[in-house]
C-alpha cells in the first residue's frame, strides 16, 4: 500500500507498505484523518484474508490502529435504505467496511464524488459520468481503550483515555412522517430534533459534553415543503434540541456544516435518502472562532428563517487536558457570504474567490485567538459543488484552489446542494491533524 501523508504541521511525508499508525513523530495532534479510495480499501481488506487467513477486522485494525469512526463518501446511487451504520443498495459501498468492521461507526454521505479532470494522480473521468470514485474518511486517535456501542439509530465509539467520541446517527424521515404532527412541525424538523437530542444525551452520559465538529447531510435541503424550505426546517429542529438540552445557542457552539444530498423523492414527497448526522466530541471544550467579515450564523436576521443556524465559523481544539498537543482546527462549511448576504450571484468562480477570502479571514482570526498560525496550504479541504455535471467549471474551481493554497492542495470534491439556493459552492476545511491519503 502506498501512502502519502502529511503531518500535523502540514509537512509532506511518504510511507510505503506501512500501517497508517497514529503514533510516532508524524502525529503531533490527538487526531489523524485518512482518506482511502473504495478500491484500495477493498484490496487491503480482501488481500489480507487471502494471504494468511487474517480477518478483515484484523487487517483493518493493523492498518488503521485507533480508528474511532468513518464516513462513506461519494458512493453514487446509494438509494433507499441506510440502517444504523450499514448502507444497502446495488451501488452502495458501505457494507465493505460495515461487514468487515461492524463495531466501527460508519456515517453514510450520499453525495457523488467529483474528480477534476486535470488533478494529478486522479482518475481521468468526467464528473457526473457515473464513474466510481467513492472513498472513505477514517478518523484515528492515539488510544487503545476504544469501545463501541450501537443504540438504535445511534452508533458510536469512544475512548475514556483520550476523552473523545465519534458517533453516527441515521434517521429516515418516513418514520417521522407517520407520527402525529406536534406544533405543526414537519417530519424533517422532528427527525432533526430527535437526532440532536440523541447526540446531546449521549455526550452528557459519557461526560464528553463538547461537540467539536458536526456534519449534517440533509436530503433535498432547498426544497419547499410544509410551508417552509427544508433547510429552515432543519435549523428549527436543531435549535429546538439545543434549547431542550440546555445548550447555548450563541458563542460557544460547535463547528458544523449542513449540505444537501441530491436524490429523488417518493410519491408522498419523502426523500429516499436519510438524514445523517455524524460528529466528533470531547471531554474538553474547543475555542469557537468567528469571521470578522461575516455576521455570526447564530445572529442571522429573521429573513433567513425564524430559527437561526446554530454553529460557529470554526472551532480550535487542543486535545485532552494536559496532553500538550497542537490545536486541531475545524472550519465549518464556508461560502460566498459577506455580512449576512450572499454575494456574486450566479458566478461560481467569483463565489469561490470570496469563499477563499472568508477561509483566510477565519485563519487570521484563529491566529489572533492563539491557534496556529495556519495558512491555506495547511488545510485539508472538502468542496461541495452544486453543478456536478460541468467538468470545465470543476477544473476551474480546482485551479483557483491550487492558486490560493498551492499545487499540492488536499481537496475532496462532492456534488451537493448548498444550504442557500443562491450559493453555488461551499468549502469546509481542517488543519492541525495528520493526514494520509491511500489511492
Residue map of PLM features:
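N-terminal presequence-like segments and the immediate start of the first folded domain
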Residues: 2-439
Amino acid at each position: 500500500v502506498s501512502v502519502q501523508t502529511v503531518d500535523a504541521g502540514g509537512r509532506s511525508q511518504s510511507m510505503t507498505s506501512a500501517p497508517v499508525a497514529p503514533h510516532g513523530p508524524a502525529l503531533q495532534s490527538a487526531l489523524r484523518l485518512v482518506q482511502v479510495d473504495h478500491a484500495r480499501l477493498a484490496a487491503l481488506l480482501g488481500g489480507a484474508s487471502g494471504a494468511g487467513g487474517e480477518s478483515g477486522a484484523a487487517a483493518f485494525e493493523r492498518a488503521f490502529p485507533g480508528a474511532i469512526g468513518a464516513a462513506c463518501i461519494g458512493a453514487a446511487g446509494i438509494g433507499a435504505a441506510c440502517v444504523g451504520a450499514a448502507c444497502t443498495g446495488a451501488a452502495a459501498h458501505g457494507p465493505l467496511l460495515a461487514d468487515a468492521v461492524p463495531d466501527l461507526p460508519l456515517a453514510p454521505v450520499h453525495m457523488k464524488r467529483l474528480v477534476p479532470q486535470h488533478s494529478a494522480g486522479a482518475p481521468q473521468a468526467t464528473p457526473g459520468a457515473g464513474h466510481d470514485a467513492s472513498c472513505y474518511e477514517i478518523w484515528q486517535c492515539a488510544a487503545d481503550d476504544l469501545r463501541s456501542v450501537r443504540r438504535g439509530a445511534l452508533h458510536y465509539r469512544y475512548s475514556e483515555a483520550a476523552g473523545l467520541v465519534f458517533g453516527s446517527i441515521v434517521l429516515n424521515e418516513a418514520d417521522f412522517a407517520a407520527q402525529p404532527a406536534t406544533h405543526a412541525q414537519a417530519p424533517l424538523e422532528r427527525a432533526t430534533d430527535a437526532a440532536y437530542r440523541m447526540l446531546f444525551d449521549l455526550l452528557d452520559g459519557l461526560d464528553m459534553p463538547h461537540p467539536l465538529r458536526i456534519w449534517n447531510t440533509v436530503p433535498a435541503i432547498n426544497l419547499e415543503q410544509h410551508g417552509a424550505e427544508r433547510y429552515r426546517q432543519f435549523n428549527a429542529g436543531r435549535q429546538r434540541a439545543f434549547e431542550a438540552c440546555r445548550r447555548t445557542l450563541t458563542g460557544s457552539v460547535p463547528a458544523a456544516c449542513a449540505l444537501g444530498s441530491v436524490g429523488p423523492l417518493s410519491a408522498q414527497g419523502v426523500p429516499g435518502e436519510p438524514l445523517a448526522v455524524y460528529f466528533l466530541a470531547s471531554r474538553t471544550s474547543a475555542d469557537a472562532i468567528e469571521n470578522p467579515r461575516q455576521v455570526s450564523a447564530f445572529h442571522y436576521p429573521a429573513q433567513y428563517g425564524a430559527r437561526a443556524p446554530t454553529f460557529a465559523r470554526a472551532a480550535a481544539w487542543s486535545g485532552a487536558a494536559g496532553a500538550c498537543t497542537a490545536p486541531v482546527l475545524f472550519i465549518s462549511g464556508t461560502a460566498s457570504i459577506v455580512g449576512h448576504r450572499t454575494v456574486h450571484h450566479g458566478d461560481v468562480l467569483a463565489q469561490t474567490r470570496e469563499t477563499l477570502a472568508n477561509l483566510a479571514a477565519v485563519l487570521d482570526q484563529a491566529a489572533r485567538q492563539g491557534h496556529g498560525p495556519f495558512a491555506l496550504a495547511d488545510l485539508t479541504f472538502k468542496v461541495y459543488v452544486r453543478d456536478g455535471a460541468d467538468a470545465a467549471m470543476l477544473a476551474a474551481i480546482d485551479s483557483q484552489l491550487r492558486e490560493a493554497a498551492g499545487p499540492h492542495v488536499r481537496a475532496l470534491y462532492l456534488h451537493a446542494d448548498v444550504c442557500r439556493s443562491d450559493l453555488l459552492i461551499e468549502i469546509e476545511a481542517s488543519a492541525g491533524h495528520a493526514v494520509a491519503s491511500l489511492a
